Amino acid sequence: MHVTGTMKTLVLVLLCAAGTTGAFGQDQAATFKGGVDLVALNVVVVDPQQQFVGGLTAGNFAVYEDGVLQDVSFFAAAELPLDLAILLDTSASMYDKIATAQKAAVGFVSALRPVDRLLVIDIKDSARVLSPLSHDLDAARSAILGTSAAGSTAIYNGLYLTLKEMARQKQPGQNLRRQALVLLSDGDDTTSLVSYDDVMELARQAGISIYTIKLRSSQFESDMARRNAQASKSEYAMKELAQETGGRSFHALQVNDLSGVYKSIGHELASQYAIGYMPTNQRRDGAYRRVNVRIVDRANAQPRTRAGYLAPRK
């Protein structure tokens, strides 16, 4: 699941009568109410064959912040409601790939449940909200299919706007929800006003899992020699952003590849564990805190979550 980066909470109220260690897909709700800082993590656990590991309990997780063991105060193994942001590159460089990108995005919409919400943003010379975060999946689907390719590419502007918009939707006292962002693009930024560092800083604050899908075509491959330096830089940026936030980075060559990619992301989001802890370090200094999760009593189980977070400032 995805919760928040750092959320202010004094009381975690579980509104589900069943225990928090139930199987995936179990309905569960939680409410946050203001006070001290809770650090919330989405954790995916896989075996050596990259299959998701289910059936874990809070006792199987050891959470460290800057090397110091933390007390886990919240744990859920249930599939919680999802807030999903789809960021769609519709610049001119996507002309030969826009239909593929649209099909992949609509696939995400079809996989969502009534309890989930979807935000759609496209990027050309600037970023704009095509469909606000809501349960209206039909409107989101229509917005996606109505896009066309033109203009330059402001990927970092789009990521920044999306992270800001998702953060704005977090309200004190609301039910606990997962949050994730999926970027479909050819990966080359050309006109953003904000920098990659700006996006990374905001991502570390927001705690939203970011998944990047880099689309390619035969034209892209033939241009690789000329664009090698730029392509390598943008590819590294997308991979680093996904890794830092606990998401994943994918490369898709054909529409059939994309179908498997979005199914893989959906399965992963449904298989996440939600973990929350009150950090022993209560300083509000804006410093970066490194987070490490280890699995106890499960040989070869490999956890993946965000690498850390930025502490709030006073």
Predicted regions and their residues:
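Short, aromatic- and cysteine-enriched interfacial helices/patches
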Residues: 3, 23-24
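N-terminal non-cleavable signal-anchor helices
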Residues: 4, 12-14, 45
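Bacterial N-terminal signal peptides
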Residues: 8-20
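Scaffold/interface architecture of coatomer-like assemblies
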Residues: 24-314
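N-terminal secretory signal peptides that target proteins for export/translocation
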Residues: 1-7
